[in-house]
Amino acid sequence: MNKFTHRVFRFVIRALLRLIADIELVGFDKLPASGGYIIASNHIGRLDAAIPYFVLDRPDIIMVVAEKYQKYAFYRWLVRITNGMFIDRHNADIGAIRETLRRLRAGGIFTITPEGTRSKSGNLIEAKAGAIYLAWKAGVPVLPVALTGCEDAVVVARLKRFKRLHIRAMAGEFFSLPQEVRGREREAVMKKYTDEVMCRIAALLPPERRGVYAEHPRLRELLSEM
């Protein structure tokens, strides 16, 4: 996205969100002004996707939209103006993966929801290893982010009653992965670091939102360090 389009797009996003929501940001004040990294967040609603544009004044955010939305004119327009991509989430979309890696290596920011789908309950569900694969291949750090208040049901219910939303976005600490592992141990190591990402997100969430990671030993370790 060029700088002018980014400024206009971000202005609109921020204006709309401020119109309907009180947004609390925690931990975003020390983010680097340049350099590639992956934001890994929980996925609780459609409004999640707007938060990076509210928070980050960076024109190199990498937007991806599920291929199933390509039939809608709004999403085609959105992908075009943001220089985004449609991606097949159910199969290995090699072209989209390669382009994402290229942009990450060039210093872009990629937001991914490791769970792969919206959690209907708002609680964490079991994640997939996509974030770890991309971080390994691109050689970039991961920033865990926890969101609350963006749940689709909550958004609809409050807006129907003309009540403002209360959205909270909390960033944790960057962490980098060790060198990529190959061979027999690869799957187990990817699972280990996927759990690491999710436990770091869980540590930023209220206890009732930690879902399947609530009793994870690594989460207990992280909470004891806070």
Which residue stretches match the model-derived regions?
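Short gly/ser/thr-rich secondary-structure transition/capping motifs
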Residues: 18-26, 151-153
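Helix-adjacent hinge/juxtasegments
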Residues: 85-107
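Membrane-interfacial terminal anchoring regions of lipid-handling membrane enzymes
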Residues: 1-11, 15, 24-33, 102-105, ...
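Catalytic core of membrane glycerolipid acyltransferases/transacylases, capturing the structured
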Residues: 3-6, 10, 18, 32-91
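A cross-family acyltransferase "interaction/gating" segment
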Residues: 31, 123-188, 192, 218-225
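Hydrophobic/aromatic ligand-binding patch that stacks against planar heteroaromatic rings
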Residues: 55, 78, 102, 133-137
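Catalytic-site beta-strand/loop segments enriched in glycine and acidic/polar residues
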Residues: 103-131
